């Protein structure tokens, strides 16, 4: 499945706009543990433990969105948007959305 942030796919014609699709993932984060992990892992300004959690949550949300698009008969998703929110008690939510299309 082709997934893109752009509104179209170069060299491909969108035959049908099917529906808006989305996916969400909420990951629990122990603030104290993550704070110490960040201090320990910071190399070149990057916190490896936190980045790993972000990637895991993003992958789960993207997979959920792709599966929904596939169930609706789409073979591509255009206009992808990825949002990150910290919700109560230090939990992280990743929400992705886009338009399921058939090319």
Swiss-Prot record:
It holds the Pfam family YbjQ_1. InterPro entries: UPF0145_dom_sf (IPR035439), UPF0145_YbjQ-like (IPR002765). Disulfide bonds: none annotated. NCBIfam families: PRK12855.1, PRK12856.1. Belongs to the UPF0145 family. This is UPF0145 protein BCE_1095.
């Amino acid at each position: 499945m082709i997934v893109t942030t752009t509104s179209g796919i170069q060299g491909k014609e969108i035959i049908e706009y099917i529906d808006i699709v989305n996916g969400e993932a909420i990951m629990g984060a122990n603030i104290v543990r993550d704070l110490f992990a960040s201090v320990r892992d910071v190399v070149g300004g990057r916190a490896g433990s936190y980045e790993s959690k972000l990637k895991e949550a993003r992958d789960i949300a993207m997979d959920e969105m792709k599966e929904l698009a596939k169930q609706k008969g789409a073979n591509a998703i255009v206009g992808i948007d990825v949002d990150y929110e910290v919700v109560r008690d230090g939990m992280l939510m990743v929400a992705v959305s886009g338009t399921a299309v058939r090319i």
